[in-house]
Structure formats: structure tokens, C-alpha cells
Amino acid sequence: TRTIDGVALEFQMVPETEAPAELNVMFPERKTLVIGEIATCSLHNILTPRGAQVRDSLAWAGYLTEAIRIYGDRSETVAASHCWPHFGKAEVRNYLTLQRDNYKYLHDQTIRLMNKGLTQAGIAEELVPPPSLTNEWTNRGYYGTYSHNSKAIYQRYLGWYDANPANLNPHPPAERAKLYVEAMGGAD
């Protein structure tokens, strides 16, 4: 807790979620929690399509649990960077809980399917969130999706290799195309 220019602030560090260094800020006198980007109006990316380190979806869910525990009963407003505010203790708690449940479900079900031997592509096809999560507009995949986020979680734990030896050291696309043409009897 810090007082800056007469305003009391409480900080919750939430590293390795949306960014390597991220934090939430509580304004206790205003009963307002600024949740940063760990709760938004859509499922967030666990790995950005443009590239970055894979984010820790399990820690992400854990920090949302911590925010609910620390601030849930004290917050009457929650504001997020890329979302409209939510008002009322019940709505704040519901919003944060559903966001948390979404990331936890995504993580846990990806791990379950990995343990069943599914590949990244197989998990992306198999994993479908339940209506209890997707009925909430702010949990839907308008930004991040279950498909590419499950692949990111797979990558975080098992890397890029899919256990198919043909994919370990593949030919570049141009060379592979020549080999396909040759295997089909040539260009003529």
C-alpha cells in the first residue's frame, strides 16, 4: 500500500500474465479495482499470434483468484484496460470469477488432453468450452481463442515438436514441392 499525492493505492503484482511485468491497482477509498489486462471483455491471448513468450495461464487464473480473495468483498467497481467497467460487488465478483474460471478451464483441459496423447492440432479441435463459460459475453474468443490458446499451452509445456518424426527435420516448402512432383511422375 502506498499513498501518492494523498490517494491510497494498493498494488497486486501479477507477473507473467498478460505481460512479463503486470499489476492491478486498488483504490480502497473509491472501492475501485483497476484489473489491468488480466480480465478483459474477451478471452485474451496466451500467446500472441505475432510472437512472444507463452504466458502462464495457470498463474493467470491464480492471480485472478488472489484478486477475488483480496479485493472481491471490497470492490464495488472493477475497471479493465480494454473493457467497460463493472459495477456492484456481486457483478465485480461474478466477472472476475468467470474470467478466472475461463483461464483455469482452458489450462486444465489442455493438460488433460495432452495427457491423453493428443497433439496441438488435436487438442485445438477437441477442446470446446462449456456453455457455463461461453454464455458470458466477456469470456468468448473475440480476441484470443480456445484453438490457438490451447496450442500455446501445449507449446509452454511440451514445445513445438508433435512427436511425428516427419516433422522433426522437414524439407523446406520449395524442396518438398519438387519431391511431390517427382513422386507423382514429374511435371509432364
What are these model-derived regions, one by one?
Residues 8-116:
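Metallo-beta-lactamase
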